Amino acid sequence: MASSRKTRKLGRKIGRKIGRKLERQQGGIRRTKGNPSKGKARKPQTTLADAPGPNQCFPRRGHVYDGVCLPLDVLEKVSGKLGLAAASASQTKRALFSQIAKALGVDAMKQRSVLEAMPLPAAEKTALAAEWLRPAQPAAWVSDPDMWLDTVNIRDVMMQYEKGRDDFTFLGPYPIDFAAAEDSGPGRAGTSDRCLIGEMCGLDLKTSKDYIGIIYNLDPHYKSGSHWVANFINRPAKTCYYFDSYGMRPPHRVYRFMQWLTIQMPGMELGWNGRKFQFSDSECGMYSMYFIDRMLAGEPFLKFCRRAPPDKFMLDMRDWFYST
């Protein structure tokens, strides 16, 4: 971004990764007269083929899970401990896992629950969950299945994508005032020469990884959160896309950031969706993560916008992005 007075905030010296303690934020769309919760019915264009990577399994690039997250040697060890019949050469990993789940009296669709019921030391189960499973689904979702996602819910999922791919960096989730002075707050602009989020203000596309995903909350850092939106930067393709499940244009601070990237990489294409995806009041966090997942999977941005997966699909994907 140019070093003019209008854009000096993003040219500040890089401070700490997070210059100060940030409010744990949530995101959703509050229903108002101008924000209807229902829209026109549309034909579904999204199927399980468009699901975000492996179901409940750690999204490790290039790894094939065959429907079961845990490795075969762990399943064979547990099978022996349970006294089950030895697995035959033709028995699939999925069949063995189902056999174990049945013996433990646990739904085989709930891979974390099966792991937790296995006769293994607690420390080993914790290590296996961290290596092979998606983050645990919050217990509060049982009674409130469409609860707004918060900062921690999103970070836990997206950091697995960063760990599972050596060509991807996740930034966030960050508040919309990421470029403000470190000592800014309600009613004060701040005078510090350090940026609130140093890794955003100091992002260098020349040295960055090929793909960068960013999730923002439209509230500033001192508020509790309002709505989640996202950016995806594809360095090899020289593109930067903005996604808002409500179909709104990038807010000024995000658009300035995107323009700054074009100064670093002349010819970079900027784009955003004009179509509204979300008609409920709760799935903006899921939409933002799903958008980044699909961009990493190579889905063209225009196709993604035309497909516009519905709220119901996003709600179902909570059992996909999080292990139960």
Residue map of PLM features:
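Arg/Lys-rich, intrinsically disordered low-complexity tails that mediate electrostatic binding
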Residues: 1-44
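Exposed alpha-helical structural elements
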Residues: 153-157, 253-257, 312, 316
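Residues that form generic nucleotide/phosphate-binding pockets
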Residues: 157-161, 257-264, 320
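Contiguous terminal or domain-adjacent regions
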Residues: 293-324
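Cysteine protease catalytic domains with a Cys-His-Asp triad
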Residues: 38-229, 235-240
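Cysteine protease-like catalytic core of ubiquitin/ubiquitin-like
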Residues: 205-303
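Alpha-helix boundary/capping residues
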Residues: 161-164, 261, 291, 308
